UniProtKB/Swiss-Prot annotation:
Residues 1-118, 221-241 are annotated as: Disordered. This is Eukaryotic translation initiation factor 3 subunit J. Its main location: cytoplasm. Keywords: Coiled coil, Cytoplasm, Initiation factor, Protein biosynthesis. It is found in: Cytoplasm. Component of the eukaryotic translation initiation factor 3 (eIF-3) complex. GO terms for molecular function: translation initiation factor activity. The keyword Lipoprotein does not apply. PANTHER family: EUKARYOTIC TRANSLATION INITIATION FACTOR 3 SUBUNIT J. One of its GO terms (cellular component) is eukaryotic 48S preinitiation complex. It comes from the Eukaryota. GO terms for biological process: formation of cytoplasmic translation initiation complex.
Length: 267
C-alpha cells in the first residue's frame, strides 16, 4: 500500500529545535551582577557629565581668549551692536501709543550715548572732563574798585589762532614780563611758568623747546665768559698803571755833608 501524502509531509518536516536550557543560578550568585551593571551605568553618566562640563569650560576659556585677542576696534563694534540690539528691544517693549516725536527723541538720545561711549573707548587715556576748547574766564578786577573788571579771556588778543596772532600775543606779553627779570624771584617764577606752558604739549614738542633753551643757555655762557675775560684784562691794565703812577720820581737833593759834625769830633 502506497504511503499517504500526509506521511510524506510528516517525514519531510524539519526536526524541532532543541530546547533552550536556562542557566542555573548558583547559590553564590545573587543580585550583585545586576547592581554592578547599574553602578557601571551611573558611572558612565557621571563621566559624561564631567566631560560635558569640561568641554563647556574649555569652550568658555577659548571664547574669553578669543575676546582678549580682538582688537579695540572689534570690541567697540561689538559693543555698538549690543547697544543697537538693546535699543531695538527697548523700542519693541515701548507702548505702541508712543508718538513719533518722542520715539525720535529717544533714538537720538540713545545714539548720542552710544557715540559718547564710543569716544571714551577710543580715547580712554584722555581725561574727557577737561574741556580744552573752552578756556576759563580770566577776570581781572581793580582792588580799589571791584566793579571795574576785565575778562581777559574774552579779548581777541588772548584768543589767537594764526601765526601772526600768536606773534602779536608774544610781543605784548614779553615786555610786560621781562620788565621784572632783575627781581629775586623772577628765575624761579620763569621755571614754573615754562613748565605750565608746555604741560599740555606732547613729548616731541617739549623736546624741541628744551633744545631751544639749551641753545640759549650755551650762547649765554659764551657771552659771560667773554665778558669775564674782558673784565680781567681791564683790571690788569688798571693795576699796572696805578703801580707805575704811585712810584716817587723825585730826586733826593738833600746835602748830607752838613750834618753838624766837625772832623775834630772824632779826634
Amino acid at each position: 500500500m502506497a504511503p499517504s501524502k500526509w506521511d510524506d509531509e510528516e517525514d519531510s518536516s524539519p526536526p524541532p529545535p532543541p530546547p533552550v536550557v536556562a542557566r542555573r543560578k548558583f547559590d553564590d550568585e545573587e543580585e550583585e551582577d545586576v547592581l554592578d551593571s547599574w553602578d557601571a551605568a551611573e558611572d558612565s553618566e557621571v563621566e559624561r557629565e564631567k566631560a560635558a562640563k569640561a568641554a563647556a569650560a574649555a569652550a568658555k576659556a577659548e571664547a574669553e581668549a578669543a575676546a582678549k585677542k580682538k582688537s579695540k576696534a572689534q570690541r567697540i563694534e561689538e559693543r555698538k551692536q549690543e547697544r543697537k540690539k538693546l535699543a531695538e528691544a527697548n523700542e519693541s517693549d515701548e507702548d505702541s501709543e508712543e508718538d513719533e516725536a518722542a520715539r525720535r527723541a529717544r533714538l537720538r538720545r540713545t545714539e548720542k550715548e552710544g557715540d559718547l561711549k564710543h569716544a571714551q573707548d577710543l580715547f580712554e587715556d584722555i581725561d574727557l572732563n577737561r574741556n580744552r576748547g573752552t578756556p576759563k574766564a580770566i577776570v581781572i578786577s581793580d582792588s580799589a574798585d571791584p566793579t571795574q573788571a576785565v575778562d581777559l579771556s574774552a579779548m581777541p588778543l588772548f584768543k589767537p589762532t594764526t601765526k601772526d596772532q600768536f606773534t602779536r600775543l608774544t610781543s605784548t606779553l614779553i615786555p610786560l614780563l621781562t620788565a621784572h627779570s632783575k627781581k629775586p624771584h623772577y628765575a624761579l617764577w620763569a621755571q614754573e611758568f615754562t613748565k605750565q606752558l608746555v604741560k599740555e604739549l606732547n613729548s616731541g614738542d617739549v623736546k624741541k623747546i628744551a633744545s631751544a633753551l639749551t641753545t640759549i643757555s650755551n650762547e649765554k655762557m659764551r657771552e659771560e665768559r667773554a665778558a669775564d675775560k674782558g673784565n680781567k684784562k681791564t683790571k690788569a691794565a688798571k693795576t699796572k698803571v696805578s703801580l707805575v703812577a704811585s712810584r716817587d720820581n723825585k730826586i733826593d737833593a738833600t746835602p748830607y755833608d752838613d750834618d753838624g759834625l766837625d772832623d775834630d769830633d772824632f779826634m
